[in-house]
Amino acid sequence: MNLIAGNIVDRQNSLDALKRLKETTSETLQNCSLSPDIVLQACDALSAVLNERTHLPLLLSSGIREDDARTRLKQARLLLSAAYLKEKMRRELGPDWDKPVSFTPIDRSLPVTERAMPIGVLLHIAAGNMDGLPVYTVIEGLLTGNINLLKLPTTDDGVSLELLRMLVEIEPALSGYVYVFDYASEEVHLIRKLVDASDAIVVWGTDAAVSAVRRLASPHIRLIEWGNKLSFAYVTQGGMNAENLHGLAKHICATNQLLCNSCQVIYLDTEDERQALSFCRGFLSILEEEGTTVPLSLPIELQAQLTLQLKSETLCASSEGKRVFMGEGASVIYCADDSLSPSIMFRNCLIKRLPREELLPRLRSSKGLLQTAGLLCGADEKKELTELLFRAGVVRVTTGEAMSEGYCGEPHDGERSLQRYIRIVSLS
């Protein structure tokens, strides 16, 4: 289903709306402007009405475990609250970002006035690997005053559509600023029409998804890419204590390595292969132990796929310089190479050797892909290694357990996302 003018409509009605989309959005841009206060009040009201009795069943019906569903509902209430969003805007845009600023440039005698304006119409092409992402990316567009066209991810479970419907129902003034289209990525002719109606495209997802959007967009349409990134842990001898390793394993089990800030590879600060193999055995038992607290439930098809992948890894291990350590609901794979590569996910972790002297040149070969590093080291090493990781291109360093824990107003992939959704205009 689709959301047009605040109403849930079928495919045919969405296609009719798509034909008029340029005209409709132009009318909104000409006749209206969207105050951040209206968006904040609406989001806060939505946060207040979300409750377990009404909305927990919606999450449970999509196959989410009950404890996970409760956690996600609690997180949604926080992220939608006015207090949270105000702080996010303050951190990312500054306290007076929407107020005009007048000044006389050093090279002119006449004053100039600058102010922030929305880009106009944003097309959000959301990925399905992060809960609530379609809703949150639209809200970022609303906070900056933009009209938002959302193409739902194929795997969306209906929660995004319902939350945005509720938001527009709470504040009807948003109806001209939120459109949701349930079109398949293969329907290129329809996606192209959405692109043609947009001033900028916000694309989340894989390299293939980003490349596909680049091919669709004309040169004058701004691309705001939140593409595929890789994250890893770096472990030194001084960081190999039970608390650190259990925290890292807990993170791996909680995220199933599905997010851009999930640990794919554990790098060890050593050249000693025997030490690395010993680490593999010890960490596997920790991973198994933490896995019992967060049971892994996968569809039969996905479980079969993982089984085949692990079987293939085992068969090819000796010829590729690998050792596969199989456990109950988890595995670790020792690799002789030191490349940063994605794991097969779902608690199947890669272990590689990377002495700190080789850390920067190795990571520089993956520049543009680096996101979070979980640093497990001694206190006396932390400053030096943190600086080295930042110089290599990593954008966030934290503990292993906190790799996927965000905070209000944090940069995304090293950038302030809200700043990318505005433009600065000047009058002289």
Model regions and ranges:
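N-terminal Rossmann-like NAD(P)+-binding subdomain of aldehyde/semialdehyde dehydrogenases
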Residues: 1-117, 370-375
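Conserved small-residue-rich beta-alpha loop and adjacent elements
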Residues: 94, 99-170
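Donor nucleotide-activated moiety binding/catalytic core segment of transferases
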Residues: 108-126, 183-195, 329-345
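Short glycine-/acidic-enriched loop or helix-start segments at secondary-structure transitions
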Residues: 134, 160, 211-215, 235, ...
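Short, surface-exposed connector motifs at secondary-structure boundaries
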Residues: 144-149, 173-174, 193-200, 365-370
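Conserved NAD(P)+-binding/catalytic subdomain of aldehyde/semialdehyde dehydrogenases
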Residues: 174-265, 270, 404, 410-428
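NAD(P)-dependent aldehyde/semialdehyde dehydrogenase
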Residues: 255-263, 267-372, 381-427
